[in-house]
UniProtKB/Swiss-Prot annotation:
Subcellular location: Cytoplasm; Nucleus, Nucleolus
Gene that encodes the chain: RPS6
Organism: Homo sapiens
Annotated region described as Disordered, given as residue ranges: 217-249
Gene Ontology molecular function terms on file: mRNA binding; protein kinase binding; RNA binding; structural constituent of ribosome
Subunit structure: Component of the small ribosomal subunit. Part of the small subunit (SSU) processome, composed of more than 70 proteins and the RNA chaperone small nucleolar RNA (snoRNA) U3.
Modified positions ((3R)-3-hydroxyarginine) in chain numbering: 137
Residues annotated with N6-acetyllysine modification: 211
Family: Belongs to the eukaryotic ribosomal protein eS6 family.
Protein name: Small ribosomal subunit protein eS6
Sequence position, cross-link Glycyl lysine isopeptide (Lys-Gly) (interchain with G-Cter in SUMO2): 14
Taxon lineage: Eukaryota, Metazoa, Chordata, Craniata, Vertebrata
Single Gene Ontology BP annotation: ribosomal small subunit biogenesis
Biased composition (Low complexity): 236-249
PTM per Swiss-Prot/TrEMBL: Ribosomal protein S6 is the major substrate of protein kinases in eukaryote ribosomes. The phosphorylation is stimulated by growth factors, tumor promoting agents, and mitogens. It is dephosphorylated at growth arrest. Phosphorylated at Ser-235 and Ser-236 by RPS6KA1 and RPS6KA3; phosphorylation at these sites facilitates the assembly of the pre-initiation complex.
Length: 249
């Protein structure tokens, strides 16, 4: 079995082949995300602790977290699931994946060093691969250089060198995101002012509408009362005329 071991602190990665079954027994029956002591791999691995991050079987099917089995299963996968990348919007597909429990049928096991041991491992812990790009977000730049809120972040941006033959060497800096500048504060003040204006305008319009509605309702009520009074007058008039006619007879 091959072991693909990575060390995030240095950015290095190393693939080693282990033929001795006894060295691999410590990883068998362990699940993904389990931390295991790597002492069994050899003398130089003494004190190292590794985390099982995944693996592939001999046919190339990947291990999937949460599938509690040794073997292979066919799952209906959609966007957001591991081991699947949708080609079309809303596409789902039934794919073969391997369970998250390690056994002897794996061809590659991925491990991440969580704790460094006593000795250095050549090509893994003794060399450092520099990061290609620095942080872009203002808060992350502050965190990296331990800056306070008063310090100017723009002076601490990690610049990328662009060296071309026959041209002047120059550097390129990323645009800092979430940087608080006077312009940003001005935009914020403007947004708040506009919101206040809208609220005030809505309140005034609502009060005006309520006033108009009350006026219309009052007018309708008066009209209704007039109609009722008119009907009453007419009915009383009819009653009086009918009485006078009956008395004459």
């Amino acid at each position: 079995m091959k072991l693909n071991i990575s060390f995030p602190a240095t950015g290095c990665q190393k693939l080693i082949e282990v033929d001795d079954e006894r060295k691999l027994r410590t990883f068998y029956e362990k699940r993904m995300a389990t931390e295991v002591a790597a002492d069994a791999l050899g003398e130089e691995w003494k004190g190292y602790v590794v985390r099982i991050s995944g693996g592939n079987d001999k046919q190339g099917f990947p291990m999937k977290q949460g599938v509690l089995t040794h073997g292979r299963v066919r799952l209906l996968l959609s966007k957001g699931h591991s081991c699947y990348r949708p080609r079309r919007t809303g596409e789902r597909k039934r794919k073969s994946v391997r369970g998250c429990i390690v056994d002897a049928n794996l061809s590659v096991l991925n491990l991440v060093i969580v704790k460094k041991g006593e000795k250095d491992i050549p090509g893994l812990t003794d060399t450092t691969v520099p990061r290609r790009l620095g942080p872009k977000r203002a808060s992350r730049i502050r965190k990296l250089f331990n800056l306070s809120k008063e310090d100017d972040v723009r002076q601490y941006v990690v610049r990328k060198p662009l060296n071309k033959e026959g041209k002047k060497p120059r550097t390129k800096a990323p645009k800092i995101q979430r940087l608080v500048t006077p312009r940003v504060l001005q935009h914020k003040r403007r947004r708040i002012a506009l919101k206040k204006q809208r609220t005030k305008k809505n309140k005034e319009e609502a009060a005006e509408y309520a006033k108009l509605l009350a006026k219309r309702m009052k007018e309708a009520k008066e009209k209704r009362q007039e109609q009722i009074a008119k009907r009453r007058r007419l009915s009383s008039l009819r009653a009086s005329t009918s009485k006078s006619e009956s008395s004459q007879k």
